[in-house]
Regions:
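Cationic, low-complexity basic patches in intrinsically disordered or flexible, solvent-exposed regions
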Residues: 3
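Long, contiguous binding/interaction regions
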Residues: 6, 10-195
Length: 195
């Protein structure tokens, strides 16, 4: 799915995502990968002060993050658009080192969406029975589902199964991408309404 199809410089329409992660109990390697995925992806939520700056982490609340599977390099945390001479120098160094000048270009190329997951909710706590371990979460993304992130997740954790359900807020597309063994079946349908 190409982000530019919906216009990368406009305010985003939101995509609603539900992700189910499954490891079957008879596969010890899959169970280890599942536990590692959960450890990296479900993290303490950040706590912000009145000015919107991070002041710490919550002891109770959790967040789902793309950073656990595919972290953004800290050097990329500069703005696109107008830059100081120092930021422009950093942008050129970033381009050489990472292939992207800033967080915006990197996150679109590497995660498939402008920002990290937002409005996270655990829909089903880790279900651990004699057949499988499962975790189901919902989250929102800007413009598109995080297909590039999903590809990286299945490459890093090939033995676990990722099942997503996605829909765009104006119903421009929907689908049920599935990933396992390093491959993603997108299964996204564009719905073209007459203008």
């Amino acid at each position: 799915m190409q982000l530019t199809k919906w216009g990368k410089n406009k305010m985003p329409n939101w995509t609603f995502n539900t992700l189910k992660v499954v490891a079957y109990s008879d596969d010890e390697g899959a169970i280890k990968q599942f536990d590692e995925f959960v450890k990296l992806s479900i993290v303490p939520a950040k706590v912000y002060d009145e000015e919107g700056k991070v002041k710490g982490e919550s002891k109770e609340d959790k967040a789902f993050t793309f950073e656990g599977v595919h972290p953004m390099p800290k050097d990329l945390m500069i703005t696109s658009g107008t830059r100081t001479p120092e930021e422009e120098k950093q942008a050129q160094e970033n381009l050489k080192k990472y292939g992207h000048k800033d967080w915006y270009d990197w996150s679109i190329a590497e995660w498939g969406t402008k920002w990290n997951a937002s409005n996270f909710c655990i829909l089903e706590e880790i279900l651990d029975d004699k057949y499988s371990k499962e975790l189901t979460v919902s989250f929102d993304t800007a413009w598109c589902p995080p297909m590039e992130w999903l590809q990286k997740a299945t490459e890093k954790f090939p033995l676990i199964r990722f099942e997503m359900e996605v829909s765009e807020e104006s119903d421009a597309f929907m689908g049920k991408p599935i990933a396992q063994y390093g491959k993603v079946c997108e299964n996204i349908t564009d719905i073209n309404y007459p203008s």
